Structures are given as C-alpha cells and as structure tokens.
C-alpha cells in the first residue's frame, strides 16, 4: 500500500497546481505625463494591443479610480451632490466606465494605475486630526487612515464592478491632474532628497509595505476576487533607493 501512496500524492499535487495555475498577464501601459495633455498614440486603442499579443491594458491618466468615488459610505459631507467636486468626480467616473467597456470589448483585462496615498481634500480637512501627523502629512500607520483605505477600495469596486484589478504604485504621488485631491507617499522620507530619512522612517518602510500589501490583499483579492500588482521603489538597501515589483494576484479561498 505504501509504495502506491507517493504516485497518488504526486498526482493530487499536480492536479491541485493545475487548478490554480494562472495565465501570464501581458500588460500594456501608456504612461501619460501628469499635468500635460494625454499622449496621442496608437497604443491607446485596446483593439490594436491585441495584435501584439497583449491580454491586458493598464490605464494611467493620473485620474485613477480612487479619484472617481464619493466616499458617501464614510461621510456625505466629503462629496455632496451638486458640488463642483462631485461634478468633476462624476465626469471622471463616466470616462473610466467607458474605457473599461472598450478594453473588455477588445477581449483584454482592464486595470487602473493607482498611486497611494491620494484622498479628497475635503476628506483630509474633516479627518485631519485622525489621519495626519504634526507636519500635516497623511500617516498610513494611523488606524483611521487604514480604515479610510478599506472604504476606498470597497467603493472603487462597487462603482466599477467590471474592473479586473489595480496596479498600485508606492514611491511617487502625482496630483497635477486631480484638482480636488491631495496626498503623499505612505513611506516617510526627507522631502529635500530622494534618500530616506532613517531617523524618521524607523522601520525602513518594510512594516508599512507589509501592512499595505495585506490590506490590499484582504480588500481586493479576497473580498472582491480581483487582482493587485504592487509596484514600488521605496525600499532602502545599501544606502540607495531600489525598486521592487510583485504580483499579489487573485486570492483562492
């Protein structure tokens, strides 16, 4: 009996691995310059990407899905109906919906490039004492900040249920295309230099990255069954900034 057990276990392991094997995702992303007119390129068209073997498109206009939600489940004062902020948000949301539809029509998966942290200015005004440090910087380590990001992710996929996932960037935060939002990177650093301020960033950023990745996995991969791609160059290694890129993927539960 024992001699037959290993082949059975091997077969079971192979079948289990095949069950959860993921098809490679070949993404195209036109990186528009923040604050400038959008790049006019043939590669903006989803149908053209299929000809080159892409199976996913990442939209990066620096007006991402987290700038196109109202946070109404948190506080209706943040983006009241009829306000200039609401009109802008609704306009961006409509454009995003149309882009997702066009991407799917071409047979591609749709992702949005998303900087962390970017929040409505009004939200930061209301919750400043709970989410900002003494310098006015939004502090990701604070419980309220993390709670707000969970609400943000929930509202994103409620507003855009057909979105396949997010490409998260940590390291730079561009606000030129978001007149009603503000933000900063979650990893504290010396703002006068790309080099990290070790006296301020006591854990090297690893703990904040870990907490953020786990939050994203729970809210996006597990709760929504969507994908996350996590991009960052905000680690300190041998006294220089280095880049990291990983796929959290879709959780199997």
Give residue spans per PLM region.
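Bacterial Sec-dependent N-terminal signal peptides
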Residues: 1-22
